[in-house]
């Protein structure tokens, strides 16, 4: 294989790898943005169900929502 052919293959591989790096960086940026949106949404849900504090666990939100839905179901039965 000639030296020029090897250089061309290596150059093509470099271009491919740079493209993959850029794609990965774009994907990471999209995922970070999506993560921020989801965090904000969870924070809103937590506030809506009365959970406050610096550290909020998803399990706490789930439990609070379960309790609220159970209370709503009980109230609906009582009204019947």
Curated annotation (Swiss-Prot):
Record carries keyword Metal-binding: no
Highest taxon of source: Viruses
Database matches in Pfam families: GP57
UniProt keyword annotations, A-Z: Chaperone, Viral release from host cell, Viral tail assembly, Viral tail fiber assembly
Protein's UniProt keywords contain DNA repair: no
Biological process terms in GO annotation: virus tail fiber assembly
Annotated function: Chaperone essential for folding and oligomerization of both long and short tail fibers. Required for the assembly of gp34, gp36 and gp37 (components of the long tail fiber) and p12 (the subunit of the short tail fiber). Together with gp38, participates in the formation of the distal part of the long fibers.
Subunit structure: Homotrimer. Homohexamer.
Name this protein carries in UniProt: Tail fiber assembly helper protein
Organism listed in the record: Enterobacteria phage T4 (Bacteriophage T4)
